[in-house]
Amino acid sequence: MKIFVCDAFSSEVFKGNQAGVLILDEKENYPDENFMKNIATELKHSETAFVKKIDNKIFKIRYFTPTDEVELCGHATISVFSTLRTLKIIAPGKYIAETLAGNLEIIVDKDFIWMDMSLPKVEYIFNSDEIKEIYSAFNLDLNQAPKNLVPKIVNTGLSDIIIPIENKEVLDNFIMNKEKVIELSKKYKVVGTHLFTLDMNKKFTAFCRNIAPLVGIDEECATGTSNGALTHYLKDYNIISTKDINTFIQGEAMGRTSTILSKYKEDEKTIQIGGNAVISFECKLYK
């Protein structure tokens, strides 16, 4: 078992979002869940991916936070295939990631890793009373919300509450009520919340912050699945089109700025998330 720490959605070490990557030998079985959870807890990253080669084109991946196994993690998947490319285990081409969220196509090229999201779906649109409850969990009121956008639960592999914010100053300075956010996440059966504001200068698509204390993540500096969900949300409002390549900036408040790309495939239904990752550490487990 080889252990790496990667910085995802960045081309520099100590930027982007860290993920643990454990590569199992081909003849090695997955350890028991408690062991994998303990590894994730010890590494202290928001997600750790355990990857096993099934054949030359198929890799099975399981994802663990310090508290739970989750179906999918975008930045950990980018980290897995960037690591496999760096170690020359794979070459540029198309691959399949077997995950609990389904089998996803991965495209590896020399610059970026592009991964399919699960087909997007809007799971819930909030009413006015629920919207007040959502913003109050971040000590915000409705004056700090755009008038023409409403929070929705969107899923492209994991369910998140997508929360529009009026401007970047508000996004940068909100104060989370942790217990309220946990209650919201339990009540609406979501992994977390993804807050965003559109870039008024139009250099980027949006600035984002991801808050998921229910699964042990107070804030995450890059999230592939959440920005996949945000891509679908923005397309539904005709803010972006299926022809655009979108750029999301996340992690600024944490000092780990990340750049996440998204686009629609030719079918105009499947969303792909793109980015790079670099290995910052290689570790060894003694047992």
Predicted regions and their residues:
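Active-site proximal loop and beta-alpha junction motif in alpha/beta enzyme cores
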Residues: 1-72, 78-287
